[in-house]
Amino acid sequence: MYFTRDPVIETVITSREGYKLSIRNSKHLSQDPFVVEAIEVVRLGETSFFRNCDHSKPFLLPASDYEVMEIRDAKINLKAVGLDRGVKIVGSREALLKMPKVAPIVSVSEDNTIVSEEEVVADSTVAAPASTPVAPMSKKERRKEFKNEKWKDKKKQGRRRNSKEIADAVGSSQEMIDTVAEECLQESSSEEGDFSERRFSLIPPPTRLISDGPEEPEEESQPVTSVDLNESLNALVSESCNVIESILADEDTVVFTKEKDQTAEESQEQPSLSLEETLVHDRISSEE
């Protein structure tokens, strides 16, 4: 941002180690907060604003609508790395050869003791420049190396996670495509089966039109042979013989239709008799 007149910086708010600053909207809690390491309290006229110290992600927020909170930095140590990893320990054969020699045996006399002490001191001074051990690293360098290693580990872990997520997404999408294709094939096969059943179940069209009128059945003329005539004559003869025999056997019971009609007419002509007359008539007939 560019200002015609630079704002007045009232103060700079920084977070402690392991913490970060969260600038959250106090009126709209649904809005995502700004998480930064340090902010400036800037004043323009009578109003004050919060401005990010990191110019790569600039923002200018009114102090009356936003609140500043200190939150713990959510960092997970994916791999425990010691701080003394960068210190090199000399353990080669050359270092063993450059070790100071054992001091000689000290004699009882005072002169000899002084000489032996001088020899030991001289040997140690000679061995010191020869060995030249590596100086231990400072705390800042250790922290830098530790941060670099953590950053590399995080990058590797992120790549692995991304590759796994991509593989899982591809696998799930492939499974979804396969299931959808199978369902489509099943639906198409069922639709084809239903269509074929419907097609075969349709009634065939009529051979004649309604305007032509009803179709007259054709009488099949079968040729009449002499064998059929003989069989029919024999059947008639046998039936007539049977009728005659039955008539002769039942002469008393057989009554022709004309006689039946006459008896019915006579019975209708006779007046109806009472019960006593009928009884008398029955007795007379029985005596006769």
UniProtKB/Swiss-Prot annotation:
This is Uncharacterized protein CT_504. It comes from Chlamydia trachomatis serovar D (strain ATCC VR-885 / DSM 19411 / UW-3/Cx). Residues 126-227, 258-288 are annotated as: Disordered. Residues 180-194 have a biased composition (Acidic residues). Residues 143-152, 278-288 have a biased composition (Basic and acidic residues). InterPro entries: GrgA_tf (IPR054977). It comes from the Bacteria. Belongs to the chlamydial CPn_0623/CT_504/TC_0791 family. Residues 153-162 have a biased composition (Basic residues). Residues 126-136 have a biased composition (Low complexity).
